[in-house]
């Protein structure tokens, strides 16, 4: 049984849109990585010590919390935002990217 092929056969439009969103997400991640580098997540450490990993993941959690609070405010205002490029969709993509970044940190892959 191939769940991916089965899913794509049953839900072709949904599968295609999901892949488009993943591409948008990756493009945003890549452009932000070129701006920020890895240091903003590793906080100056090599992330080889479990305590450094825990500290980094806690920082990611705090960033996600900020995005969730931003989403809450945006949704209360029916999506009206005051910062260009920081709307509801952008916030959801940021949260999703932070989730992947946390996994990369925890899997010891957050490096060049």
Please name every model-derived segment.
Residues 1-112:
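Intrinsically disordered, low-complexity regulatory regions
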